[in-house]
């Protein structure tokens, strides 16, 4: 029996397509509603006093919602198969660490980070970064023992580390663990803490709601002066 939530799949697909679109469109020649509301064209300088919201502001929250809404399907299915909470937490932490590495790795290999203006070397390194991601995150569709698949992944991570440590960057920049893609880093946090919240409140919706209300109170109250 197919228990997929097609509406959730559709929302996730829409969010991915529009995230790619919003990151690649030439916003300098398009109207303001094609950019973030607080970073209007042509300069795209952040101005928090500007009111409003555009579709560009909504696509990433849509993806986060779809990701969180999928937890009962992915985690719940594994729990029904008998996986312990410890194993579920391990998988969540592993996924979060992988996403964190991904966020750091790709941020260091944007062409504009490698050289200014961009040259052939920068684009070739960016393409190499893209190529290394495949053995890092996909399972090679060949019949091999598990140790071979693991070895390929470890080798890919090793190549990525060597690339980050030995590459020279534009404007005197050097490798830094704090230089990362904030969007992917948010997904990594969601993968760890969102999964952990669901795992420990899987059978108690009221406890989950209480934790969410507590988080909401902390977020809303952080800017209140004493």
Named regions from a protein language model:
Residues 1-226:
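Alpha-helical transmembrane segments and their immediate juxtamembrane cytosolic regions
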């Amino acid at each position: 029996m197919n228990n997929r939530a097609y509406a959730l799949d559709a929302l996730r697909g829409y969010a991915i397509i529009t995230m790619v679109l919003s990151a690649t469109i030439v916003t300098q020649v398009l109207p303001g509603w094609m950019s973030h509301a607080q970073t209007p064209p042509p300069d795209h300088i952040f101005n928090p006093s500007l009111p409003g919201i555009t579709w560009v502001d909504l696509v990433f929250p849509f993806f986060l919602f779809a990701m969180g809404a999928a937890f009962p399907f992915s985690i719940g299915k594994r729990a029904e198969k008998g996986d312990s909470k410890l194993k579920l937490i391990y998988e969540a932490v592993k996924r979060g660490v992988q996403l964190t590495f991904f966020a750091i790795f790709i941020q260091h290999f944007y062409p504009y980070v490698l050289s200014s203006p961009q040259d052939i070397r920068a684009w070739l390194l960016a393409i190499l970064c893209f190529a290394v991601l495949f053995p890092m995150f996909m399972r090679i569709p060949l019949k091999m023992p598990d140790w071979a698949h693991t070895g390929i992944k470890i080798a890919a991570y090793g190549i990525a580390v060597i690339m980050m440590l030995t590459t020279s960057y534009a404007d005197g920049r050097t490798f830094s663990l704090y230089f990362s893609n904030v969007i992917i880093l948010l997904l990594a946090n969601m993968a760890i803490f969102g999964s952990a919240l669901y795992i420990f409140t899987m059978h108690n919706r009221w406890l989950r709601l209480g934790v969410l209300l507590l988080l909401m109170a902390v977020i809303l109250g952080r800017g209140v002066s004493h």
